[in-house]
Amino acid sequence: MVSLSCLISYGECLLETVQTHPWSTIGVVVFLSSVKNAPLMWHARLIIAVFYHSVTRKNDVVTIERYGRQGLFGYIVTSSRSPLYECDINGHKSDSTYFSDLDINRIHLITRLFKGAGDLSLRPDRPNVAPEDRPKKMRVLLGGTCCSFRREIKPYAAYEIHSRVLAWDEKWLYVVSYFVKPGSARKMASLQTEVGDKCEMTDLARSMVFTSAITKFVFKDGRKTVRPADALEEMGLLSASEEVVETSEAGEDLWTRSRVEERRKTGIKIAQHFIALDELHDQFEHVSEHPFLGKFGVLGTMF
């Protein structure tokens, strides 16, 4: 009875506050429901992600010995919602806000998967490689990203972002990201055992995706560019051996280097379309050939 009376008293006080300060109450509610967009919140989320993987879970390293060769293609999943401040005049998540969500998701992927890039103590021994030939402190730098929007995300709707390594070439490593409905991965896993038709599975997967994105990263050792394959081998994520390995997390790893290469080639076919966008930089040379329609500042013609 004491707890019930306390709840009733608390409710009455809350109601009185709302009636006395309605606009302040609305402001507090809007702020709390949009705390994701508070000043410096993006920086806080990024720092927390880096601290968690680099300090709290520093020794939790992804290697072939633990996760098998398929560990390189493992997903990182982050969850979020689309608060009021992220919605545009059309009443759904604004296109520009997808990129800030991708920043947080990808920093989780990079600091989880590529821990050995910046910390030599987390890399496996490579007795066949001379110490002077091994890259020292590698950085993983963003080179470009592109989003393809499929379906809108409603205000305050929940969604997940799934990201993994897609492929790599002589310079770039490509990461694919999907904005999907919560629980989509579990649903797809259960449906794979029930639905045998590949076309039907593709349609089901497509129906769960709000937006897809592709990003390219480059590995740098000082000013020197490190080939992605060399960087992955250096961090123990890629092996030239074809033998089957016993892993501590996934049991027997049935993935061979040939299968990894097959998956890479499949991914690079998709990445080729993204690579072709680099030719856009050359098109600015034609700027003088077209009419000038106006110049505007932050508030139109005022500033």
UniProtKB/Swiss-Prot annotation:
Pathway: Secondary metabolite biosynthesis
Pfam families xref list: 4HBT_2
Coiled coil: none
SUPFAM superfamilies: Thioesterase/thiol ester dehydrase-isomerase
Record InterPro entries: HotDog_dom_sf (IPR029069), THEM6_lcsJ_thioesterase (IPR051490)
Enzyme class: transferase
Molecular function terms from GO: transferase activity
Keywords: Transferase
Gene induction: Expression is positively regulated by the oxaleimides biosynthesis cluster-specific transcription factor poxB.
E.C. designation(s): 2.3.1.-
Domain of life, per lineage: Eukaryota
Family according to the record: Belongs to the lcsJ thioesterase family.
Role of this protein: Thioesterase; part of the gene cluster that mediates the biosynthesis of oxaleimides, cytotoxic compounds containing an unusual disubstituted succinimide moiety. The first step of the pathway is provided by the HR-PKS poxF that serves in a new mode of collaborative biosynthesis with the PKS-NRPS poxE, by providing the olefin containing amino acid substrate via the synthesis of an ACP-bound dec-4-enoate.
Identification of the protein by name: Thioesterase poxG
